[in-house]
Structures are given as C-alpha cells and as structure tokens.
Amino acid sequence: MFEINVDPVAFSIGSLVVKWYGIMMALGVIALVSWIFWRIKRGADISYDTVLTAAIIAIPSGIIFSKLLHVIDAWEYYSLNPGAILSGEGLTIFGAIIGATIGLWIYSRYSHFNLGYLLDVAVPGILLGQAIGRVGCLLNGCCYGEYGGSGCSVIYTNPASAAPYGVEVVPTQAYEIIFLLCLFAFSLFIAKKLRPDGQLFLLYISLYAAWRVAIGFVRVNDDFALGLEQAQVVGLILIALAVPFFIYRQRKQKEADKNT
C-alpha cells in the first residue's frame, strides 16, 4: 500500500487557484505540441504554421467536447448547478479526442493538409500528453479504482483530495500511466509498418478504447447505460467504428500494393 498526501492545489495567487491537475494537463498539451515540432525537425512533412493553427483549433474544440460529455454524464448535477458547466473541472479524454479530431477535420477541409498524416505524427505525442495528464489525476485523487486493500493499493490522506479520505483504493490512474507509456513505445515501433496515412491513429483509438472499456470495470464511476460507465459506452462505439475501418483500409492498401 502507498500513501499519497498531496494537496490538489499547487499554489494560489489571490483568488486564482492553480491545481496540479490543471498544471499536468497544460504540460501534456505542451508535450504533444513539442513532440510534433520535434518530428518536423526530423523531417516530418508538416509546416509549423499548420501545427500552430491546428493547435489553436484543436485545443478549444477538444475542451468544449470534453466538457460536453461530462455534462451529459452528470446532467443531474449540472442541471442544478449550471454555473459549474463553465468550470475547468470534469473533463473527459474521449470528449477531448473526439472534439479535437472534428475540429481538425473541419480545418483540413479548408486548408487541404493531410489530416491522416498529421494525426499519425501526433499519436506518440498524444500518448505522452495523456500519461502526463494522468499524473494530475493521480495527484488530484480523481479517477480512482475500487475500494479495498491489495498489495498495490493507495490511500489518500489529504482532506482536499478528490478520493475518499483514508480509504484504500486501486490506483487505476497509475495503471493507465503505465499502459499509455507502453502504447507510446509500441506506436514508435509500429508506425512505419502501417499504411495508408491515418492507420496509426485508428489503431491508437482502437487500443485505447479497448483499455478504457476494460479498466472501467475497476474504476469507481456512476453507471451511464447498460450497467456501464460513460467512457465504456463511448469506447465500445469507437471500437465498433475504428476497428472495421482500420481493417478495411489495411485490405485496400494490400490490394493496391499487389497492383503496383
């Protein structure tokens, strides 16, 4: 068992309260953009202007959809506290991914850059950013797992933590950090083996969605539908869309290779 006694608030300046969760989210975004810039320096066929514009579009669209999914999931609370909709709390990773992807797709229709290529280049950076963001969840005490003692449980002893005080819980945040870092390494290995552009992103969506469905049975969350939490429902939908599309595109690519 491990003890976490961290104040979720990193520091405050007057009425401005800065939490570790927000800091880690910001660092995750910085890691993603930095990764893409590093890939450009290594020869990736994307302009800096395209990346900057993409970030300006993807970040707000990701935040909006991220919050939207949480509002839908916790509508009973938000209907009674509408002002909380504008707070920085309660963001969902699937909402961020979906919102950012939609924003980038719209942008690509106007600027005509290769969206699939950009998403593939970004995948390792996305995974690094997610891992950093989950560190924020671990420090904050949110997104924890089932109650009860085990050899790898954690106990939060700061009264301000989002986790129940003094109760052993499964550190699903830490499990996800490990999974994301493993998926990061795998993405580097498999990237050059996948064609056409966009396949790495589809594989990432499929594998991460499968993970969220599985870990959802350990996490403590309210049921959304069919006895599943919202992330599990969204994950199943994404798997149903991404996996067949991935397989279809792989087969089309093999046929194209045979004809050349």
From Swiss-Prot:
Q: Where in the cell is it found?
A: Cell membrane
Which residue windows are transmembrane per the record? 17-37, 52-72, 85-105, 113-133, 170-190, 198-218, 227-247
Q: In which pathway does it act?
A: Protein modification; lipoprotein biosynthesis (diacylglyceryl transfer)
Task: Note the Pfam families from the entry.
Answer: LGT
BP GO annotations: lipoprotein biosynthetic process
Its membrane topology is listed as:
Multi-pass membrane protein
Annotated Gene Ontology MF terms?
phosphatidylglycerol-prolipoprotein diacylglyceryl transferase activity
**GO CC annotations?**
plasma membrane
What EC number is given for this enzyme? 2.5.1.145
Q: What is its main location?
A: membrane
User: Which keywords accompany this UniProt record?
Assistant: Cell membrane, Membrane, Transferase, Transmembrane, Transmembrane helix
User: What does the entry list as the binding residues for a 1,2-diacyl-sn-glycero-3-phospho-(1'-sn-glycerol)?
Assistant: 134
Primary role: Catalyzes the transfer of the diacylglyceryl group from phosphatidylglycerol to the sulfhydryl group of the N-terminal cysteine of a prolipoprotein, the first step in the formation of mature lipoproteins.
Family to which the UniProt record says this protein belongs = Belongs to the Lgt family.
Please give the name of this protein. Phosphatidylglycerol--prolipoprotein diacylglyceryl transferase
What organism is listed for this UniProt entry?
Answer: Dehalococcoides mccartyi (strain ATCC BAA-2266 / KCTC 15142 / 195)
